Amino acid sequence: MSRWKAAIVGSGNIGTDLMYKLLRSEHVDPVYMVGIDPASEGLARAAQEGLDASAEGVDWLLSRRELPDVVFEATSAKVHAAAAPRYAAAGITAIDLTPASVGPYVVPAVNLHEHLDAPNLNMVSCAGQATIPILAAINRVADASYGEIVAAIASHSAGPGTRQNLSEFSEKTGRALAQVAGADRAKAISVINPAEPPMNMRDTVYAKVRNPDADAIERAVLDMVAEVQRYVPGYTLRLIDVDGDLVTVMLEVVGAGDFLPTYAGNLDIITAAAVQVADVLAQRTLVEEPAR
């Protein structure tokens, strides 16, 4: 069976973890990895796995005789903002793991079906991928007037980009909690925990609701957790409590350990979600092609 050909732009931790996940994909074949550092471990690993790897950037990628069907952007918002129009002009679908937000916010378990034809899809943030599904589930059955999330990640899993852009990621996640999950108002708080040994990603979702039906809320949350677990097996519900109109849900995310340590569930969930998006898009396209 034919598969979508993929390029990974960015050879750091995120890009390298993406590669290992894509190597297991039934529908997406990682063909290229692009970076800017010839000494990058990610590029070396990509070459070992048989990918065509280059430190010559996006110019090199777009000069290939055979272009990819999809590109995973694992660089920076500035880099993606500049490259996105070029991908679109070349007919390449872009899955954006940066804060650039060129395309719509996408969370596979919640709203991917609304954006199947989008040329550019933004993966929100690590915290967003973990918490938006839960708030969306609560909102669907209980009408959330307010949502607030607290995402705690291990210090070792927070690179320079995360640290420098923590406020930006939190603001973006808050916007997505309202836009995608549907809460009237929302706020996101991110915490970097220096504990040793490093802790797994932990998330708490609070929601104030208008229709506090505890049984319906619990069923909705359990169903959503099961849906996310289809592509993030280490996504676990730790607590759900409905106290009047206040709902509290606690989660833990353990990474798959493909490249990153298992405590880096915050990074694992966004790469797993990005691969899930590509798998769904590729499967849909490959099914439709024979009928054309």
Swiss-Prot record:
Keyword vocabulary terms for this entry = Aromatic hydrocarbons catabolism, NAD, Oxidoreductase
Transmembrane segment boundaries: none
Please name the Pfam families in this protein's record: AcetDehyd-dimer, Semialdhyde_dh
Task: Supply one GO BP term.
Answer: catabolic process
Under catalytic activity, the entry for this protein gives: acetaldehyde + NAD(+) + CoA = acetyl-CoA + NADH + H(+)
GO MF term (any one)? acetaldehyde dehydrogenase (acetylating) activity
Active site per database record? 126
Q: Can you tell me which residues bind NAD(+)?
A: 11-14, 157-165, 266
**What Gene3D superfamilies does its record include?**
Dihydrodipicolinate Reductase, domain 2, NAD(P)-binding Rossmann-like Domain
Looking up InterPro entries in the UniProt record yields: Acetaldehyde_dehydrogenase, Acetylaldehyde_DH_C, NAD(P)-bd_dom_sf, Semialdehyde_DH_NAD-bd
The coiled-coil regions, if any, are: none
Q: What is its EC number?
A: 1.2.1.10
NCBIfam families reported in the protein's UniProt record: ac_ald_DH_ac (TIGR03215), PRK08300.1 (NF006157)
Query: What family does this belong to?
Result: Belongs to the acetaldehyde dehydrogenase family.
Instruction: Output this protein's name.
Output: Acetaldehyde dehydrogenase 2
Naturally occurring in which organism (per UniProt):
Nocardia farcinica (strain IFM 10152)
